[in-house]
Swiss-Prot record:
This is Large ribosomal subunit protein bL9. Binds to the 23S rRNA. Transmembrane segments: none annotated. NCBIfam families: L9. InterPro entries: Ribosomal_bL9, Ribosomal_bL9/RNase_H1_N, Ribosomal_bL9_bac/chp, Ribosomal_bL9_C, Ribosomal_bL9_C_sf, Ribosomal_bL9_N, Ribosomal_bL9_N_sf. GO terms for biological process: translation. Keywords: Ribonucleoprotein, Ribosomal protein, RNA-binding, rRNA-binding. Pfam families: Ribosomal_L9_C (PF03948), Ribosomal_L9_N (PF01281). Disulfide bonds: none annotated. Belongs to the bacterial ribosomal protein bL9 family.
């Protein structure tokens, strides 16, 4: 069954896209949740009428994504973590950890937009890709540091303030 997306849906596409999905998925999930409508002549006419406003909306979102990319591309996110004696982290740095660290810097993104091959489980410097919009991606630097003593915590605060001032 072909459906027209009424809003962006991560696994299928973006608002206004026509997608082919299984009948049950469309009838039982997408349509009842108002994510999509069935592709038919009436809905195609509606889509054609809405195309201009969709283009304006997409252009606005892309511009906002470019502005956000400019803000975050130079940021180094310092994440303090507890470390075992063998150098491994207690726990790991996940997408949500990165989103929380960015929120402290007043940058709001969705955790689904943070792309990592696997969670970070050791100290060091890493690079993580953030998908901001269709073709607008930004790479941010993640620095995982040891929060063993007060000296390490002070170092983290100094680096965070330096990154915010930059």
């Amino acid at each position: 069954m072909e459906v027209i997306l009424k809003r962006d849906f991560i696994s299928l596409g973006y608002e206004g896209d026509i997608c082919k999905v299984k009948d049950g998925y469309a009838r039982n999930y997408l349509i009842p949740r108002n994510i999509a409508v069935v592709k038919n002549a009436a809905n195609l006419r509606t889509l054609a009428q809405m195309q201009k406003s969709l283009e304006k909306k997409r252009a606005k979102r892309k511009m906002e994504a470019e502005i956000l990319k400019g803000k975050i591309v130079d940021i180094t996110v310092v994440i303090p973590m507890k470390v075992a004696e063998n150098g491994k982290l207690y726990g790991s740095v996940s997408q949500q950890t990165i989103v929380d660290a960015l929120k402290e810097k007043e940058i709001d993104i969705n955790k689904r937009d943070v792309h990592m091959e696997k969670h970070i489980k050791e100290l060091g410097d890493f690079e993580v890709e953030i998908k901001l919009y269709h073709s607008v991606n930004a790479n941010i630097k993640i620095k995982v540091v040891n929060v063993d003593e007060n000296a390490a915590a002070e170092e983290v605060k100094e680096e965070n303030t330096a990154a915010v001032e930059a």
